[in-house]
A protein has these predicted regions:
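Bacterial Sec-dependent N-terminal signal peptides
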Residues: 1-30
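Contiguous, structured surface segment used for ligand recognition
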Residues: 28-158
């Protein structure tokens, strides 16, 4: 075995191994499409079987979201508005300056809760897609979501 031939391979292997274990920050460019506004916070939310779901959706839209959420890697329990910890909120709200179009959404992640607000189901869908991109496996059956504040709206009308 010639050490000169093996040395570059060993160095490359150790560099790759080190990159695998290095925690990479979530950048706006990591989310596709790139959100209009994204602010990284500190800490993260642990999405697990203990996470509860609260939504103000009703009727057919609520049933549609119930089926959609069954596809998540974590099954969520229903909650009441008074519950405050380990919560995922999906909320339809009136139109605001932060939510100018039906496809706009805000996504807020703290260590206690995840909140997606939109003026329509389409906005909630896009917010959920962004949340799925941010989820990173943490331990068996749970996912870590970094603390972040995102406001997004389509740049072009469809």
């Amino acid at each position: 075995m010639n050490i000169r031939k093996e040395y570059p391979k060993v160095c490359l292997f150790l560099w790759i191994l080190g990159m695998c274990f290095h925690a990479h920050p979530i950048l706006a460019q990591s989310v596709i499409p790139v959100p209009l506004k994204m602010e990284q916070g500190t800490g993260s939310f642990l999405l697990s079987e203990k996470t509860k779901l609260y939504t103000n959706l009703q009727g057919g839209e609520a049933e549609l979201w119930e089926n959609y959420l069954k596809a998540l890697p974590v099954q969520l329990k229903e909650a009441r508005m008074k519950d405050r910890k380990q919560m995922l909120f999906l909320l339809i709200t009136p139109k605001t300056p932060q939510l100018p179009s039906p496809e706009s959404y805000t996504l807020s992640v703290t260590s206690q809760r995840i909140e997606i607000r939109a003026t329509s189901g389409a906005g909630l869908f896009y917010g959920m897609q962004t949340l799925l991109q941010l989820m990173q496996p943490a331990s068996t059956g749970s996912y870590s979501v970094p603390s972040v504040e995102i406001e997004d709206t389509p740049r072009f009308a469809y």
